[in-house]
A protein has these predicted regions:
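Acidic/histidine-rich catalytic cores of soluble enzymes
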Residues: 1-90
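C-terminal helical cap(s) of enzyme catalytic domains, especially alpha/beta-barrels
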Residues: 125-140
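Acidic, His/Gly-rich catalytic cores of divalent-metal-dependent hydrolytic chemistry
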Residues: 92-94
């Protein structure tokens, strides 16, 4: 299976919104072998308001692409805010998305069952082990 990733929309990259991803996917002959990786930083940077309208973003994702076609999540915070088109990952809880968003994500019955790939830099004060423990601690 090939997974297309949601992109932040910097420069001329493809996949900067759900409609572009849907168009690409619709052009693939064997649709059963193509899906989406939802990148949390990229979605915010592309202009999807995950902080204040999580349900609306998920509804739009479902309407345009279909939640069943989302196969994985890149979990990361964003150094920049909504619609910045910057693509600069931040450690969990240290960026613009914040802990309330990640609490919502890891407790969303649809999204929580997907593979989540931590995509942050290890800092001297924060390790991937710390971030994984933080995310697990948010699960109800």
């Amino acid at each position: 299976m090939v997974l297309l990733e949601t992109m932040a929309g910097k420069g001329t990259e493809c996949g900067r919104n759900f409609d572009e991803l849907a168009t690409i996917m619709d052009g693939v002959e064997n649709k059963a072998n193509v899906g989406v990786t939802f990148d949390t930083c990229h979605a915010l940077d592309a202009g999807y308001d995950l902080e204040n309208d999580y349900d609306g973003v998920m509804r739009q994702l479902n309407e345009v692409i279909g939640l069943a076609r989302v196969k994985a999540i890149h979990v990361n915070d964003s150094q920049f805010g909504l619609g910045s088109h910057k693509d600069r990952h931040a450690n969990i809880g240290e960026g613009q998305l914040g802990i309330p968003f990640f609490t919502r994500l890891v407790n969303d019955p649809t999204m929580a069952k997907l593979p989540m790939i931590l995509e942050t830099k290890e800092q001297t004060s924060t390790t991937h082990r710390d971030e994984i423990a933080l995310l697990r601690g948010l699960v109800d």
